[in-house]
Amino acid sequence: MDENFVAHQLSPSSWSRYEECPRKYWLSRQRLPRKASMPAAMGTAVHNSVEDICNLDLSDREESEIGWLPPTAKAILDRHWALEKEAFLDTPRHPRWKDEMITKAHDGLVGALNILFSKSRMEKTALSGVSVGMWRNVQSMVLANEGTLVSECGRLMGRLDLLIADLDEDGNSTGWVVADLKTGKPPKIDLNEKVSRQLRFYRDLIKQNNPDHPPLHAEGWYSSNQTVHRAEGPSVLDDAMIAWEGMRHSETPLEGTPESQSCGFCEWKAWCPTWWAARRDGTLPPGGVFRDEVVNLVRFDPN
């Protein structure tokens, strides 16, 4: 093996960055200071809360107890919200922390729990009416949560939110569902191509790692409006391996492809001369105030 070889893994997010702009992907691997994001912090708090609620030990509670889930969920979310706030404010590059977004986070958590409960095929009920016994049934349906998926070759990886049993109307398992929880804006009709590819990526890794798997499909669960969108289509692993080849480590910066959409959401553009040149030359339209310029102070003359 080449002594200068640097191992790398492709994930759905790094794949998307590479496609949008190879320079963006290259910069993301240079250990530059990351920028905290309020939507990302909220999403992490909701995801981690769902994980904890799925893993609750309810062995010391009565099967018939109700009214326990809303306050338990709130306490768990509040704890993760505080942890995310601390990490957010400790990040050198961060905007204002928005305490008011905890309401949206709470609604997202309720939405996620409602979707999960609906998959149990039990009669629909408010979360306050969910008994301990009912939630144990939900937990028994969850086969895995918040796990890491890695391909056989080790080159592809992803983070699994939930793997659940696909139940029929009688509560019998007929297969598996790979579920990815989404706290962002839901699609109006169909999943966009990148989200569909992400979901199929998880689906295909599970198929590869479990040759004797039952019928399996992938879904995006959108907590904001409690909708479920199924990802259909062929395997994406061959395309992922082709992309992996192009994403090999390079000391030389990869090509920059400035474009309004990809540059607008790039947290590393302050380190990208291509972005600065595109702004200067008019390739990119002037935008609002950009507060992340990175400079080296060479000399300061107070006079």
Please place each PLM-identified region on the residue numbering.
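Short amphipathic alpha-helical segments and their helix-coil junctions
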Residues: F5-A7, E20-R34, V178, K182-G184, ...
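Short, charged/polar micro-motifs that form catalytic or ligand-binding hotspots
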Residues: F5-H8, P12-S13, L32-A40, L149, ...
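Metal-dependent nuclease catalytic regions and adjoining charged, substrate-binding loops involved
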Residues: Q9-L10, I189-K194, D204-F290
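Nuclease catalytic cores
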Residues: W15-S59, I66, K74, H106, ...
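A non-catalytic, helix-rich entry segment at domain boundaries
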Residues: D52-L143
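Mg2+/Mn2+-dependent nuclease catalytic core
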Residues: N137-I242
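OB-fold (S1/OB) nucleic-acid-binding surfaces
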Residues: L181, P302-N303
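Structural detector for short beta-strands of small beta-barrel domains
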Residues: P285-P302
